[in-house]
């Protein structure tokens, strides 16, 4: 602090009553008053104009107030209120020099500023010096009486006034001792106090409640300057430690902290200028409110720009910060302590309230960082839980035990991390984030649990599917009386091998027995559904299977060798056996049989369909007499019905229609074989032919061309008869047969001739190539067949080859129509029609008849 600058007087309020805030702020900064807290005192001086007030202050406190120049005349020197700091006196003492009263410049009637300045001095001063002349003591019309009356009057305007020390300084003391002057002065003061109108609350209040009255005397400065200076120095000693108990202002009340002195003074003067009653307690609260707000705002700004806080905030954005709670708590505590240090002297209630607001703002500022820290801890806890759980499960530990141990350790670690992140200044509750972490762990555990259970279930299902699908399909392909018994045994064997292993794996999850049994039951139901779905799939292709079974039995013997229809076979019996085998297959696929209870499906189908009792025996028989005129099987649950009785009846009709061709073909083949291997005509017929046809025979022998033409004609007619299937065409009548044969005759004849010509050209080409390449050898020439003779491999023989192929129906899978949902069998008739073989009738057996002409 620059003492010279501090002692320099600064105008606080000018002569017009305007508060000089700028110059006052410069004074406060230069004098260092703001940092004194409550350890400062304010001294002001009142008195008549030109009574030596400024001189006394300069001598007493070492200030530099402007003094009157007596050589220029007696006039007003101090205008308004001036302020300076006392040099060399502790505690810090601020001195105010007020404009003198009773000055001719303002006039007798202009006392407004006088009263306002007096009230201002009483409101902010701890000690008020009353400068008065010694010769005025005891006078009725003394110059000091209006001043005292003014002081006492304005004191009444102070609501709950503070106690102020009034130090009467008697100037130009005479020979009368002070001991005699003081009682007279006090008596005059009491009279003036009694004469002042007071509120009812203070009507009988003694002056000592408002003022601490003290009296001192000083000799004349002009006449006894040395003595004056000595006594002034003695008086100066009384201002040392003036605010300490027993000092001049030891019992002062309502002190405003030094940092709020300037603002308080400005607001008090504003109220006084508005001619309002001055409520000092309320003013004290107001000053405390404003100053505490300023201090709090300043400390909050300091926190926002604090380098440590900015670094901590930046670090926590990228990841968890070790020791976050301690670091953040230290930063907050530093700034809160600075607030407490500066605001400690203000009103406690206001200070505490503003501190709470500052604390709230600070916590709101730093809480996002705390929440970010918790978010990092939450993420880290969940990731660590996932990793540790996977490692624990991989080690072979049971799922429930692994979850229990891992959850407990990670939640405890997270709870400890949250506790370390909390600062002492806040009562942040992290139970919600802890609950969120718990839910995260539970959700992840549930997800892993469902995944593990699903994995176990899918693995068991896959094993069941592999164990059941192909064997069941194979059993259905070889359907027989024991098919369902074999399926039941297979189902029991595989489920008893797979389900216990599955149940053992579930033990590690420590689930309730009802839940475990439910999962095993569902898996068993899944195994049943595999069999049932396969049965439904095969039932949808039952017509194909029936035709395949029929073809296998009908076209092959008991050694599985293809049959050759030589005419010795009983086609009727073989066909009945083949149809019976197909009917048994139909009965197997008609219903699902999970129990060992026998049913009558095969018996009903055999008696109704195979024995030919599909239709009623008499016209009067009702539909109810037909056992297949129903949608359910007796003693079979509808849900286990694959093919209803009515569907079986429809399938059987379609099956018979589509297999009738194979039977007819077999019969035709037998007949052709018999015709091809028939005996020669009877002897009498041969004799008759020789006698009656002797001339014709001789003609043919004499002219071989006729014989050749006859042979060629025979072959053509024979080929046409085979191709046109004359016998079959005439089964529907003579006229339709003639029309049909006539329509097919010319195209068939053209095809035969084209075939013969092509085969002859190919054979001639082969002979020429062989003759050109073969070397000359000494061999007997091989006799070549005449061109008019046909070998077993002749073109005509090749032409007949497709007619002797054995019956082999094409197997084609039938895809169920999406629109058919009411029946297990999907469009059996259409499926059968798609599978109908397209073959020619075989009138002969090529293996036994080559039709060679030598």
Curated annotation (Swiss-Prot):
Polar residues bias: start-end ranges: 842-854
Compartment list: Endoplasmic reticulum membrane
Enzyme Commission designation: 3.6.5.-
One GO term describing the cellular component: endoplasmic reticulum membrane
GO MF terms held by the record: GTP binding; GTPase activity
Binding site for GTP: 47-54
Keywords: Coiled coil, Endoplasmic reticulum, GTP-binding, Hydrolase, Membrane, Nucleotide-binding, Transmembrane, Transmembrane helix
Membrane disposition: Multi-pass membrane protein
UniProt-listed GO biological process terms: endoplasmic reticulum membrane fusion
Residue ranges that the UniProt entry lists as topological domain Cytoplasmic: 1-680, 726-854
Record domain GB1/RHD3-type G: where: 37-252
Residue span of region Disordered: 758-854
Lumenal side: 702-704
Pfam families per UniProt: RHD3_GTPase (PF05879), Sey1_3HB (PF20428)
PANTHER family: PROTEIN ROOT HAIR DEFECTIVE 3 HOMOLOG 2, PROTEIN SEY1
Stated family: Belongs to the TRAFAC class dynamin-like GTPase superfamily. GB1/RHD3 GTPase family. RHD3 subfamily.
Function: Probable GTP-binding protein that may be involved in cell development.
Protein name: Protein ROOT HAIR DEFECTIVE 3 homolog 1
Species of provenance: Oryza sativa subsp. japonica
